[in-house]
């Protein structure tokens, strides 16, 4: 890494999140003897999967100046669709495909509402958040579906590689890699950054901004549906409120990872580090037996912290640059003597 | 509503202006109102200013000249408290001052018109004029909207601008936005007024109005620092001229002691011809064909033919609909009627247009031209990303090579191609936009104000480039408010007024008078 690149990283949001992660690991290790344990780490990974998967789509959505608040409800609706089908002896593969299609359609609806009518995605997805949850309620009411096929509910453990790494872990790792490559190494990702950073420039350069956005909303819904499958197989049950409140965690992860809510900035790497951070914090709270309400408050606090941190880091970087400049000037290395007139 | 403060009417403003203290005049004997001594500024690895001196006296118009990236805007930002100098000091009325913030400079009655308008797009014109100082009435004080609009209207009238004070700024053209900023600076009744390239987007008539206002202010004792690249304007306006080159002070003398050649030599360090002479070629096969293009309420019945090797100028006043036609041709704006064909192929979307070989260099470089936060190389590669990439995967090495190649051809002044255009001077940002579109190697090129804010040397470079491209068979539509530029380069000149093409002139018959006559309403033309 060149010194300029090193400096850029040192004053980046990602670096800040890495530091927070280290601090969190140290603190939780001190607090609980059960934390530093391979089995616990495997558990953290399992518990973070669904959030992480959805965050992989939320990151580029934030980069492109949009947001999807309906992901928790989409997950719930998809889970209910799957539960209904699977418990009524529909072949597993067909049920899985129908579930994924449900998520994709939900995302498509969001995307079309946002782009066709030029509506703000906060408003649209706040609406569909209620709509999708309502649909889930209409389908199953307040019953809990537990009659899921064994081959599915056990997939977590049965196909485990060794005792620690499960199939969902591997799938997530692959998805994260694919997302990182797509966002940071492909032409699609490049267009996403332009569409988020300068939408008019993107349009003038032939980028189909609306199409990109619809695609990202579809990805968001699809990943939420896949997360629904993971969650269902993990919890072995489905209810209408499955996945509620998940959007808060996903957003916390994405913003804590350095994505700028004003668009144009964000990395999959940052999101993954923040995912680990939130996983560790949640594990610490579980080990410490914190009540549920307190956990939500902690997550909310993290979200606020991440937003403030963005501003503070920006200010720090500017100050550091100024100090470097002054030093160089005082040294006079690059300046010529005052011209005499 | 209990008590209503008397609105600050134009009459009242006149009174207040009279309170400007008497000053010795323009003989130079007085203490400078604002002075910079040995001021330096470094950004990262770039020395923007290197021990520069400047002194502004009351009642003079002082021109600051230099090539793109010479440090003019940086100096103005230091004078108005946006940047702090790394070395040197500022003095107001001979006393050393330290501007920590723009507010501190404003307290010393220093007002600035920035190079790129910085307004609140969602607010109305009047609010932008009086931002932070809106007239209040009632208790608790509320903004007196009526007085504010009336006063804004008066200020705008003083500038010769017919603008609705209640209009939303986001709906204004660049030139109109600039007038709003100007009105804001006027309303502060500053002792020092800094104007950074105010005329780049204005038509000759608007420039005349602006100069009248600036001279009026000078005669009332205001010190004016004026930045521009059009030499004829500088000679028409300036009392003194200070020249910067590569961040260094070159000289400062009375305008009368300079002529065009000496000024260019001071800026560039060598001799440059002021206008490039066109090498005309016989136009080849027809390329772009526009028939009956219309957009309700904006323009109508526009026909255009561009042949290979031909340059067609599109002249007219700001607001005549030239940019709107270009946007519709490229497919960015909806069309209500008409067709666009390139070599027989129908074009509807920007994607189709780009694929067929059409390129469009837009007028507003910061909003439509470059993404100022993303690297130069990524910007240059964007329109041909598919070609630069390998099956959808980025090849950063090729992007950088592409950007370097075009950067060199246009003499782009940047640290490296990974730099963000936000850190570049205005003229160099314009070069990035040009590089980006020339790199697509188009068959038809639409240029909307391609040399706005570009320095003399680079302007000649760009003119030569346009000429070369045409000679090599490219068809070019040149939209420009710089009439000499249009006349020197075009084979044919189309003139637009209020959304219609009012004249089509062969270059031999295109004189400034005929163009201006077609561009303005007949009634005015007769009166003139
Ligand atoms: N914020 C910044 N960060 C880094 N470099 C900067 C910054 N602002 C200006 N520079 C550099 O300082 C130099 C002087 O820029 P400046 O904007 O003052 O030029 P200018 O004389 O106003 O040019 P123009 O005629 O094109 O407007 C340029 O090389 C520019 O790239
Ligand atoms: Mg400038």
Segments (PLM) and residue ranges:
Chain A
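Single transmembrane alpha-helix segments in multi-pass membrane proteins
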Residues: 25-88, 112-119, 254, 258-268, ...
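Hydrophobic alpha-helical segments embedded in the membrane of multi-pass proteins
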Residues: 48-57, 73-77, 108, 173-174, ...
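Short loop segments and helix-boundary regions at transmembrane helix junctions
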Residues: 2-10, 67, 87, 104-147, ...
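Structural signal for alpha-helical transmembrane segments and their membrane-water exit/capping regions
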Residues: 20-36, 64, 137-140, 181-187, ...
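Transmembrane alpha-helical segments in multi-pass inner-membrane proteins
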Residues: 218, 224, 234-300
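Transmembrane helix-bundle core of multi-pass membrane transporters
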Residues: 117, 121-185, 212-215, 234-243, ...
């Amino acid at each position: 890494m060149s010194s300029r690149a090193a400096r850029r990283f040192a004053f980046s949001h990602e670096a800040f999140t890495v530091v927070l992660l280290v601090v969190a690991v140290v603190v939780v290790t001190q607090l609980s003897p059960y934390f530093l344990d391979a089995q616990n780490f495997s558990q953290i990974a399992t518990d973070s999967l669904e959030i992480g998967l959805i965050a992989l789509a939320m990151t580029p959505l934030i980069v492109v100046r949009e947001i999807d608040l309906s992901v928790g409800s989409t997950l719930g609706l998809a889970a209910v669709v799957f539960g209904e089908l699977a418990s009524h002896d529909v072949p597993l593969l067909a049920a899985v495909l129908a579930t994924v299609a449900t998520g994709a359609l939900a995302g498509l609806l969001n995307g079309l509402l946002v782009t066709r009518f030029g509506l703000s995605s906060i408003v649209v997805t706040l609406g569909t958040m209620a709509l999708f949850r309502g649909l889930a309620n209409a389908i199953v009411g307040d019953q809990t579906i537990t009659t899921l096929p064994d081959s599915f509910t056990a997939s977590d453990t049965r196909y485990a590689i060794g005792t620690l790494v499960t199939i969902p872990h591997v799938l997530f790792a692959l998805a994260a890699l694919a997302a990182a490559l797509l966002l940071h190494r492909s032409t699609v990702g490049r267009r996403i950054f332009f569409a988020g950073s300068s939408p008019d420039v993107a349009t003038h350069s032939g980028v189909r901004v609306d199409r990109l956005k619809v695609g990202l909303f579809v990805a968001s819904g699809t990943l939420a549906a896949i997360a629904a499958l993971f969650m269902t197989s993990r919890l072995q049950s489905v209810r209408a409120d499955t996945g509620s409140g998940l959007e808060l965690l996903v957003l916390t992860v994405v913003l804590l990872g350095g994505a700028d809510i004003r668009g144009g900035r964000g990395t999959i790497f940052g999101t993954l580090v923040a995912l680990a951070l939130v996983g560790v914090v949640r594990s610490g709270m579980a080990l410490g037996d914190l009540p549920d309400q307190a956990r939500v408050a902690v997550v909310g606090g993290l979200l606020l912290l991440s937003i403030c941190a963005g501003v503070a880091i920006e200010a720090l970087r500017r100050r550091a640059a100024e100090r470097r400049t002054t030093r160089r000037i005082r040294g006079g290395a690059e300046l010529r003597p005052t011209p005499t007139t | 509503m209990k008590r209503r403060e008397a609105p600050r009417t134009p009459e009242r403003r006149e009174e207040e202006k009279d309170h400007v203290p008497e000053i010795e005049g323009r003989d130079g004997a007085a203490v400078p109102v604002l002075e910079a001594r040995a001021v330096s500024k470094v950004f990262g690895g770039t020395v923007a200013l290197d021990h520069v001196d400047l002194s502004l006296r009351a009642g003079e118009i002082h021109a600051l000249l230099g090539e793109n990236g010479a440090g003019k805007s940086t100096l103005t930002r230091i004078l108005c408290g946006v940047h702090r100098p790394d070395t040197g000091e500022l003095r107001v009325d001979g006393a050393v001052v330290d501007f920590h913030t723009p507010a501190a400079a404003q307290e010393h009655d220093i007002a600035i018109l920035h190079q790129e308008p910085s307004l609140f797009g969602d607010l109305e014109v009047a609010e932008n004029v009086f931002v932070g100082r809106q007239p209040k009435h009632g208790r608790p004080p509320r903004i007196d909207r009526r007085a504010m609009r009336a006063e804004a209207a008066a200020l705008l009238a003083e500038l010769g601008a017919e603008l609705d004070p209640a209009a939303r700024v986001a709906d204004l053209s660049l030139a109109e936005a600039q007038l709003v900023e100007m009105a804001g600076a006027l309303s502060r009744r500053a002792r020092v007024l800094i104007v950074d390239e105010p005329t780049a987007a204005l038509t000759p008539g608007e420039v005349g109005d602006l100069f009248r206002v600036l001279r009026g202010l000078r005669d009332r004792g205001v010190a004016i620092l004026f930045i521009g690249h059009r030499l004829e304007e500088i000679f028409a306006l300036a009392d003194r001229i200070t020249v910067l080159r590569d961040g260094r002070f070159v000289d400062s003398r009375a305008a009368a002691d300079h002529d065009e050649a000496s000024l260019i030599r001071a800026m560039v360090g060598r001799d440059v011809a002021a206008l490039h002479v066109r090498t005309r070629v016989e136009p080849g096969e027809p390329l772009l064909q526009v028939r009956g293009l219309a957009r309700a309420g904006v323009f109508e019945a526009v026909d255009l033919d561009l042949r290979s090797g031909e340059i067609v100028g599109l002249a007219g006043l700001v607001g005549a609909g030239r940019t709107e036609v270009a946007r519709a041709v490229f497919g960015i704006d909806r069309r209500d009627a008409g067709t666009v064909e390139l070599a027989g192929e129908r074009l509807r979307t920007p994607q189709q247009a780009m694929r067929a070989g059409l390129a469009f260099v837009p007028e507003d470089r910061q909003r439509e031209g470059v993404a100022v936060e993303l690297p130069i190389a990524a910007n240059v590669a964007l329109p041909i990303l598919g070609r630069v990439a390998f099956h959808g995967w980025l090849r950063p090495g090729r992007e950088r090579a592409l950007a370097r190649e075009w950067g060199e051809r246009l003499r782009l002044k940047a640290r490296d191609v990974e730099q963000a255009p936000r850190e570049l001077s205005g003229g160099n940002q314009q070069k990035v936009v040009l590089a980006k579109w020339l790199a697509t190697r188009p068959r038809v090129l639409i240029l909307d104000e391609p040399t706005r804010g570009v320095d003399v040397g680079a302007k000649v470079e760009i003119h030569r480039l346009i000429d070369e491209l045409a000679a090599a068979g490219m068809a070019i539509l040149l939209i420009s408010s710089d009439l000499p530029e249009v006349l020197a380069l075009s084979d044919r000149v189309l003139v637009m007024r209020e959304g219609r093409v009012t004249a089509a002139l062969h270059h031999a018959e295109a004189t400034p008078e005929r163009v201006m006559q077609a561009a303005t309403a007949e009634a005015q033309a007769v009166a003139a």
